[in-house]
From Swiss-Prot:
Similarity-based family: Belongs to the tropomyosin family.
Description of how the protein assembles with itself and partners: Homodimer.
Organism: Locusta migratoria (Migratory locust)
Keywords: Coiled coil, Repeat
Comment, domains: The molecule is in a coiled coil structure that is formed by 2 polypeptide chains. The sequence exhibits a prominent seven-residues periodicity.
Identification of the protein by name: Tropomyosin
Length: 283
C-alpha cells in the first residue's frame, strides 16, 4: 500500500513534473512561436528591407550609371576645359608677346613719330627759309636782270653812239682831207695867182680856223670816244659781271631747287613712314 502510495506519489510527482514540463514546453512553444512569428516578421521586414535595398541598389546603380556618365562628361569637359585653358594660356602668352612687340613697335613708332615730327618741323623751317631765300634770290635775279637789261641797253646805246661818232669822225677826216687838198691847191696857186692872195689868204685863214676847230672837234670826239669806249668797257664788264652773277645765281637757284626736291623727297619718305607706323599701330 505504501508502495502504491509511493508509486502514486511518484506518478503524481511525475505527472506534476510532466505537467510542469508540459507547461514549460507550452511556454517554450509559445515563446518559440512568438520568436518564430517575430523571426517571420523580421524576415518579412528584412525581405522588404532587402527589396527596398535592391530597389535602392537598382536606383543607386542607375544613379551611379548616370553619375558615371555625367562624370565621364565632366571629365571630358574638364579635359576640354584644360585644353582650352592650355590654349588660352598659349594664346595669352602669344598675346603678351604680341603686346610686348606692339609696345616695342609703339615705342619705336613714337620715337620715329617724334623724329618725323622734328624732321617735319625742320623741313618746314627749311622750306620757309628756302622760300624766303628763293624770294630773295628771285628779287635779286629780277634786280640783276634789270641791271643786265640796263647794261645791254647802255651797251647798245654806246654802240650806236660809237657808230655815230665813227661816222662823224670819218666825215671830219674827209673834210680835213678836202681842206688839206684845198690848202695844197691854194698854196700851189699863190705864186701863179698873187691877185688872189688875199682871197686865198682869207680862205686859208678860214681853213686854218676850220682846221683848228676840226682838230678841237676831233679832240673832243676822241675824248668822247675814249669816254664812250671806257663806258662801253665798263658796261661790258658790268654785263659780264651781271651774266656771271646771273649764272652764279642760276646755279644757286638750281642747287636750292635740288635741295628743295631732296627735302620734298625726305618729307614724302617721312610721311610714308608715319603712314606705315600708324597702320602698324592700328593693326
Amino acid at each position: 500500500m505504501d508502495a502504491i502510495k509511493k508509486k502514486m506519489q511518484a506518478m503524481k510527482l511525475e505527472k506534476d513534473n510532466a505537467l510542469d514540463r508540459a507547461l514549460l514546453c507550452e511556454q517554450q512553444a509559445r515563446d518559440a512561436n512568438l520568436r518564430a512569428e517575430k523571426a517571420e516578421e523580421e524576415a518579412r521586414a528584412l525581405q522588404k528591407k532587402i527589396q527596398t535595398i535592391e530597389n535602392d541598389l537598382d536606383q543607386t546603380q542607375e544613379s551611379l550609371g548616370q553619375v558615371m556618365a555625367k562624370l565621364e562628361e565632366k571629365e571630358k569637359a574638364l579635359q576640354n576645359a584644360e585644353s582650352e585653358v592650355a590654349a588660352l594660356n598659349r594664346r595669352i602668352q602669344l598675346l603678351e608677346e604680341d603686346l610686348e612687340r606692339s609696345e616695342e613697335r609703339l615705342a619705336t613708332a613714337t620715337a620715329k613719330l617724334a623724329e618725323a615730327s622734328q624732321a617735319a618741323d625742320e623741313s618746314e623751317r627749311a622750306r620757309k627759309i628756302l622760300e624766303n631765300r628763293s624770294l630773295a634770290d628771285e628779287e635779286r635775279m629780277d634786280a640783276l636782270e634789270n641791271q643786265l637789261k640796263e647794261a645791254r641797253f647802255l651797251a647798245e646805246e654806246a654802240d650806236k653812239k660809237y657808230d655815230e661818232v665813227a661816222r662823224k669822225l670819218a666825215m671830219v677826216e674827209a673834210d680835213l682831207e678836202r681842206a688839206e687838198e684845198r690848202a695844197e691847191a691854194g698854196e700851189s696857186k699863190i705864186v701863179e695867182l698873187e691877185e688872189e692872195l688875199r682871197v686865198v689868204g682869207n680862205n686859208l685863214k678860214s681853213l686854218e680856223v676850220s682846221e683848228e676847230k676840226a682838230n678841237q672837234r676831233e679832240e673832243e670826239i676822241s675824248n668822247r670816244l675814249r669816254t664812250l669806249t671806257t663806258r662801253l668797257k665798263e658796261a661790258e664788264a658790268r654785263a659780264e659781271f651781271a651774266e656771271r652773277s646771273v649764272q652764279k645765281l642760276q646755279k644757286e637757284v638750281d642747287r636750292l631747287e635740288d635741295e628743295l626736291v631732296i627735302e620734298k623727297e625726305k618729307y614724302k619718305i617721312i610721311g610714308d613712314d608715319l603712314d606705315s607706323a600708324f597702320v602698324e599701330l592700328i593693326l
